[in-house]
């Protein structure tokens, strides 16, 4: 090590300085997370027009490699603003771009071995691709288009099934997608399908509390006597009489908190104490506790899916592949540096070139940061007609009007930070 430091301390030529400059610029340029910090401040302050202006500016000055993230964030801002149709247009564009990016570019992969993962076009984590359809389903449900919403729900479930069975990934289906499927099917009076979706959501997240009400009611209605008896014994406090002819339901979906953010951490890849940096998800605070009031009913929203937990699971499945790529990258850079040293007949220059090349070997910390940490749900049985829903979270209170017809299920989607 002392010998190496002496080599590095010697004066170098302009070529080395030029190489250093290029590598440093490559490592630092185009940090999407940093460039959109102001956008996130506006978004979390519910200044949605300001967030959209900021995203447009980032899009104009930014790189194509961040194009998917711009679309995802824009679609989510429009969704939070209640611009359901506009959000779906952007999300559809994001879905199409994501599909195109899934075709791996050989030149891009090779380039990442010399520079770093941040120089590739962002393709999205597996769960982020699934969330495109979840957001679209909620948009369609708010627009009253149950069939289009169910298409998106089925797409989530089918994609997850493919990931598990064909790609051998240790994922589970998303409870929020199955629960939303139950809500939509119940609204369509497809009782058996609604029961199946509610039952699957309960299997994935057994801590649903009062949200098991439709599962109790529909298990009895569809003649699943053994299931009904077991549920009734477990939840004796949950009333579940049949719906009256003039009765309706309101389901409130609260997208709560901030999705976790990627941060670098070091992993040991061998017995020599050598460390490689990889990304891990770190929480950005806790999701707020949410209370929902409708008339004289007051419910605490129940967490159906922790997206923070899903994100960590999905990223953890990629760590092995990341380490392998990093090792391959180190090997390629060592070869390039050795070649440079041989060509210039300077061992010192080769060593410095390797250090400079490897200094840019940073993990990709980009992610879809406008997503929530959790999906929380509250539901109510109410007379048909117009109702005001009051949502309280983190000291912020908002009111939302929903009009629901007899026998139907009204949906209210709210974003809270």
What is the meaning of each model-derived region?
Residues 24-48, 57-61:
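Bacterial Sec signal peptide processing site at the extreme N-terminus
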Residues 63-67, 98-109, 161-170, 202-230:
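Boundary/linker segments of alpha-helical solenoid repeat arrays
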Residues 225-417:
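Short loop/turn and low-complexity linker motifs enriched in small/turn-promoting residues
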């Amino acid at each position: 090590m002392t010998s190496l430091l002496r080599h590095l301390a010697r004066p170098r030529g302009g070529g080395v300085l030029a190489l250093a400059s290029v590598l440093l610029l490559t490592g630092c340029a185009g940090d999407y997370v940093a460039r959109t910090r102001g956008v996130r401040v506006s978004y979390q302050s519910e200044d949605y027009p300001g967030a959209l202006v900021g995203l447009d500016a980032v899009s104009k000055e930014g790189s194509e490699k961040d194009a998917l993230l711009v679309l995802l964030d824009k679609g989510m801002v429009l969704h939070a603003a209640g611009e359901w149709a506009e959000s779906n247009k952007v999300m559809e564009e994001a879905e199409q771009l994501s599909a195109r990016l899934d075709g791996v570019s050989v030149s891009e992969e090779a380039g990442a071995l010399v520079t770093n993962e941040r120089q590739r076009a962002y393709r999205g984590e597996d769960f982020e691709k699934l969330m495109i359809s979840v957001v679209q389903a909620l948009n369609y449900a708010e627009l009253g288009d149950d069939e289009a919403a169910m298409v998106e729900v089925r797409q989530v479930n089918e994609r997850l099934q493919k990931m598990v069975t064909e790609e051998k990934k240790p994922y589970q289906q998303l409870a929020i997608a199955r629960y939303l499927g139950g809500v939509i099917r119940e609204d369509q009076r497809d009782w058996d399908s609604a029961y199946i979706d509610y039952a699957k959501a309960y299997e994935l997240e057994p801590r649903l509390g009062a949200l098991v009400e439709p599962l109790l009611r529909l298990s009895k209605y569809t003649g699943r006597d053994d299931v009904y008896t077991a549920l009734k014994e477990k939840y004796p406090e949950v009333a579940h009489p049949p719906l009256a002819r003039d009765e309706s339901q309101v389901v409130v979906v609260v997208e709560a908190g901030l999705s976790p953010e990627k941060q670098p951490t070091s992993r040991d890849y061998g017995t020599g104490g050598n460390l490689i940096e990889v990304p891990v998800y770190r929480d950005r605070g806790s999701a707020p506790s949410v209370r929902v009031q409708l008339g004289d009913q007051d419910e605490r929203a129940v967490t159906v899916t922790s997206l923070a937990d899903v994100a960590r699971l999905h990223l953890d499945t990629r760590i092995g592949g990341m380490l392998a790529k990093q090792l391959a990258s180190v090997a390629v850079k060592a070869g390039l540096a050795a070649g440079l040293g041989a060509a210039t007949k300077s061992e010192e220059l080769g060593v410095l070139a390797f250090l400079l090349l490897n200094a840019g070997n940073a993990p990709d910390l980009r992610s879809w940061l406008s997503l929530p940490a959790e999906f929380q749900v509250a539901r109510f049985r109410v007379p048909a007609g117009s109702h005001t829903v009051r949502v309280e979270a983190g000291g912020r209170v908002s009111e939302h009007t929903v009009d629901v017809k007899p026998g139907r299920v009204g949906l209210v989607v709210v974003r809270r930070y």
